[in-house]
Design a protein with these regions (language model features):
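Extended, well-ordered protein cores
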Residues: 2-293, 299-327, 331, 338-407
């Protein structure tokens, strides 16, 4: 074998380098610059339309948070939908440490169940009488499922997610908890159940992170020793390495599973473009329970915007991202296909650019108004609102085929 051939073999360190938010930002920038130069096949950028997207985000932010006291974009906002403080139910009467563990348990499981529910699904919450759909419905359904002890092997302590119970999750048990039925179909049940079972398996294999017996909330104990602040990138790095094996049928490099990662010819080397949407959504959603548990989480802007259909849909519906062929938006696309990778990469890059414009218009600095607040204020809601303006069912402008483990 030649020296050149030896050099072409990817190493585990090259693979591990892709397991970071920095790699997401850099590889997405590679693709976005190629789009700006007109070198890609599927989309073009109409940069002067970014002002319209920023205007919408600013208007939504001022309407939702008139005092601009915007909380972090996280799963916790969904748990309080309808004005009910459901988070107050979690591990009532427990001490600070156990409450932090229980909230981490819920955040991780709930985010992993947060892939698109489909347009027909609704959750009827008996306790409040609310009928909820999409992300809010999935959040509340997951909280109520945990309240019943679905994710706990100990009937006496339902507010926990441990490996033993996760290993027993089936599509049928999720269907019951999430009220899946004819006419009320929740898409991706098989994929969701498989994801949780695999989650239980990786917890057992990592006792240093999840303890013995293995429990998701033990991550709090892993991160809590010492007085040093915890960076958001450190949180994400732990999640990516711990959960890499749970994603079904994804790309591996040098034996390292890369999780939420696609390919695009504009990216260097093997053309790999990581996004790590769900793991970053978990990382954002762990900030609140970690801080409530006494930890200081810093460098929040080290994480990226989330490459999903509300943020990405905002840019498509505002005309910032324009398909070269309008017919591209007329039929479902595979989640790992080149046009979807291109669209998601543009979304990550444009969210950083959008954040600058939003801060300028709100009179805020990056320290006062990090990206996580732009998302919450925010781009996600603006993306949903314009989707309902354009399409009666609020569906995204680009349809992506999902197995319940990506979007």
């Amino acid at each position: 074998m030649s020296y050149a051939a030896l050099k072409a073999v990817p190493s585990a360190s090259e693979a591990t380098a892709l397991l970071s938010a920095g790699a997401v930002r850099a590889r997405c920038a590679n693709v976005s610059e190629a789009v700006r130069r007109g070198e890609t096949r599927y989309f073009r950028l109409v940069s002067n339309r970014l002002d319209e997207a920023a205007r919408r985000v600013v208007d939504v932010t001022r309407r939702r948070y008139p005092d601009l006291a915007v909380p972090y974009h996280s799963r916790w906002r969904h748990f309080s939908t309808g004005g009910f403080d459901r988070a107050a139910l979690i591990a009532r009467g427990a001490d600070t440490t156990e409450t932090a563990r229980a909230r981490i348990d819920l955040a991780i499981v709930s985010v992993l169940l947060d892939a698109g529910a489909g347009p027909r699904w609704r959750y009827h919450e008996a306790e409040t009488g609310q009928v909820l759909s999409r992300s809010e419905g999935l959040a509340v359904a997951s909280l109520r499922a945990m309240q019943t002890g679905l994710f706990s092997a100990d009937p006496a302590t339902p507010w926990r997610a441990d490996a033993e119970a996760l290993a027993l999750i089936t599509p049928e048990s999720l269907a019951r908890a999430f009220q899946h039925a004819a006419g009320n179909e929740l898409v991706g049940l098989e994929g969701r159940a498989l994801l949780l079972r695999k989650l239980g398996e990786v917890c057992v294999r990592s006792p240093a992170l999840f303890g013995v017996p293995a429990r998701l909330g033990r991550l709090y104990d892993h991160w809590s020793p010492g007085d040093q602040p915890l960076s958001a990138n450190e949180v994400l790095g732990t999640l990516l390495k711990a959960f890499g094996a749970i994603w079904p049928g994804r790309i591996s490099l040098a034996g390292v599973p890369l999780g939420d990662c696609g390919r695009h010819p504009a990216a260097p080397g093997d053309g790999l473009v990581p996004f790590h949407k769900l793991c970053q959504w978990i990382a954002y959603s762990l900030i609140d329970p970690l801080q409530a548990g006494g930890l200081r989480v810093v460098e929040l802007d080290g994480l990226t915007g989330l490459a999903e259909y509300r943020n990405g849909g905002l840019f498509l519906d505002c005309g910032v991202i324009a398909p070269r062929d309008p017919d591209l938006l007329q039929y479902p696309l595979d989640a790992l296909s080149e046009p979807v990778v291109e669209w998601r990469a543009l979304t990550v890059t444009l969210l950083d650019e959008l954040a600058v414009l939003v801060r300028e218009r709100l009179g805020k600095s990056a320290d006062d108004f990090p990206l996580v607040k732009v998302l919450e204020g925010g781009s996600w809601v603006a993306g949903r609102e314009i989707a309902f303006e354009r399409r009666r069912d609020g569906s995204p402008p680009l349809a992506v085929v999902t197995d319940g483990t990506l979007f």
